[in-house]
Amino acid sequence: MNQDTPLANLNGPEVPSGNVPPANPPGRTNVAPPAQGAVQQPPAPAARRARNPHGPVPPAGPSRSAGAPAMLELSAAYPMYTEQRRAPNYYVPDAQLLFHTLGVCDQLMTTTDRFLRSMPSWLPIVSQLYVSVLWNVMILKVYVNTGYGAAYAHDLDVLLNHLQINECMIPGPLVPFFQSLAAVNGPFDWIGDIIPAMPSFTELWTDEFAPHAAYARQIPIPAILLDQLYRFATLAFDAQLQTNYATFEWYSNIFNQDVNTHNARLRLGPQLCGSLFTTQAQCDSARAFWNPAFANGFTRIDAANGPLMAFPQLLGFISQDGALQSNWFMHISLIMHKYAQYFNGSVPLKSISPVGIGASVIYGTPLEDTNVRDWLYPAAAAIAPFRSTRFLPRRELPATLAVRFAHADHEIEEQAEQYSILCHTNMKWYVNNATQNNHTAIEGNYIHQGEYWNFTPFRYSPPVSLKTQFAQVIASRYHQQAANRAE
């Protein structure tokens, strides 16, 4: 035996008497110092999940799993499957808080001398008409982009590629409202997409020459606003007065029908949540511009001349006899391009993404309140015609309006919740406040369609009341007394 070979230990290897000392950890590599002069920003947090809508997808068949040994082979012959609920979940966006916010902007602009001198043709109803067009176009843009709004694809193509509405500027304070419309996929793979939608023309516009009762408060109809601007500009007045400032009444005659003839739902639109107040000087200068502007190439809608037949007529771009009329929008877009320069954060419509934020999954429910009920279902006197001397909106948001927001998405980001709470674009007005004053009740199946809206929510907000808080932020953070330079 080799003398260098150790003898075997018959009792086995020795057991250590203590713990094994830990291995030496690798040394820490220090982070390289930032380059001098470089901007240091924290990385943006990644989204918790992909937000792009799935689009129309056929239901999946039952899944198959591998067999199991022994007794489990009996149940393996009956594999479970996921029930696909991929039907889309629609909601009709609400624009009432949007126009309240626009009303705050308009109040600031009535005292912005540089703007008024450069745009004597501006009036608050011009702002309302412009925003109502952009709002409808944005809804169509999202709806068609998801693959579900094919019926509106041609109309959208004309609006974006021929009228170039994608280039129109959105005033900064209104940008979050447009961003909140983005479509998203459902909270689970087997839940359908959640999409803001536009009702079909026959659902939106009734044979009574008025919007459907469920949509009258939520969807602005540009044709109604255009009709009022035309009547303001062309209605004759007493030559001795030299002005119609103290005599002209908004909404006293709509589509050539007076207040006792036209449907009262024409006076429930969301634009009436904003004020039409202006000074006499601005009123007179605007009329001097719009009177000749409407002289050629425009025909006013007349309810006596037969029903409207297509959605572009509600936007004001097609007359009752089918003729294209878009000169009025050219004037308005020029005015509002200058208007947007007086607000920080203004962006073109084309910059708003149709997918991604996630605010669409969150909905608000108003608390029961007498003032809110009177606002939703007003008495005739509360929606009567009014003059430009009236400072308050005709349908002013009630100060007691409180809304509780909720959703059933387990991965939604807090920023999406903030967008929804701020903008109030997904609302269940049909809950908690019953109809009155002979109004037709708002029915939920017209506003929300799809199984997601029936899921039990698990995230809630406290009651939210933002009406009086917009003015401070807009005045201090957005509005400028001098126009921002175009980039």
Curated annotation (Swiss-Prot):
Described function: The capsid protein self-assembles to form an icosahedral capsid with a T=2 symmetry made of 120 subunits.
Keyword Kinase: no
Regions of compositional bias (Low complexity) in chain numbering: 30-41
Location in the cell: Virion
Native source species: White clover cryptic virus 1 (isolate Boccardo/2004)
Record keywords, A-Z: Capsid protein, T=1 icosahedral capsid protein, Virion
Protein name in UniProt: Capsid protein
A single Gene Ontology CC term: T=1 icosahedral viral capsid
